Amino acid sequence: MENVAIIVGAGSGERFGSYKQVEIINNKPVYQYSIDAFLDTKSFSKIIIAIPKKLINVVAEQLAEDRYKNVILCEGGVSRSQSVYNAFSMISGHQNKIFIHDAARPMINKKTILNLIEFSKKEDAVVLAKKITETVKSVKSNISNFTVDRTNLWISETPQVFNQEVLEKVYDKKLDTIHEYSDEAALAEDCGYDVIIFENKNPNIKITTKEDLSEITKRIDSDNFFGLGIDFHSLDKGDGIIVGGYKIKCDLKSVAHSDGDVLTHAIIDPLCGALNLGDIGEHFTNTKQNKNNSSIK
């Protein structure tokens, strides 16, 4: 049994105001975060992304690297459910595990996917979901009628995982009405399948508004750290200069307490800065112990 991923990114962006799936976060389009997460698991034989016809050439160009050679582009449909079906129709065989994920959820990560793979091995249908912890109100005409019992309430997310034969059977029964279902888990439930909950405790925000995109950008940015470093040494007569751990033979040498390896020092210094560890000189002081030491060691 092989794992196949379907990334659903064929929305028109009507509510968002543009194609949110190709919005850029840190020099990378939104949809690509999901593809990369699935690729990083090294557990998928094929990844199919459903996208609008207008974006096929754009996405094909963005995925031209060899890393994405097993990613297949599929023209989406008029609805989310139709887009999933279009992608599903491109899958051969009958014994695959199908992972369906929204491209608008770029915060999905390798660890969660790997956990889902393991959890779903013995299940026909699994949905990633988050338990509701906040108070929920039933509202009519902007008036709160009553507080809903949240004991058994969960927020359905993606990925959702199905045995291929499950989807084949539900499509046989419901193909003409799939547009009536908000996701494939609801479709499977209506056909009598038990959809097992796999609890997600990690952020998995779905981009619906500009504010969602802004929030996700902040969260992804918070995982990035930057450091700036520089190093230089005076030169004197000698028998060579150390650069990157290698000695370049010449009639000069770096004037330094250590070996004066400017390349290694210029790399270590920004790493210390990015990790808020201070300057390289704070860790390697001018002591007898450090005299003429190799910087790469």
Protein language model features and the residues they cover:
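N-terminal glycine-rich phosphate-binding loop and ensuing alpha1 helix
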Residues: M1-I56
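Conserved N-terminal catalytic core of the sugar/cofactor nucleotidyltransferase
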Residues: Q32-Q95, L175
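Conserved beta-loop-beta/alpha segment of the NTase-like Rossmann-fold superfamily
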Residues: S79-K140, E157
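Active-site His/Glu-centered metal-binding helix of metallohydrolases
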Residues: A104, L263, I267, L271, ...
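Glycine- and Gly-Pro-enriched alpha-helical subdomains that act as flexible
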Residues: S120, C272-K297
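Short, flexible, basic/aromatic active-site loop/helix in glycosyltransferases
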Residues: K137-Q160
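Conserved alpha/beta core of the MobA/IspD/sugar-nucleotide pyrophosphorylase nucleotidyltransferase superfamily
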Residues: W154-G227
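Terminal domain-initiation and capping elements
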Residues: D223-F232, G238-G240, G245-Y246, C250-S258, ...
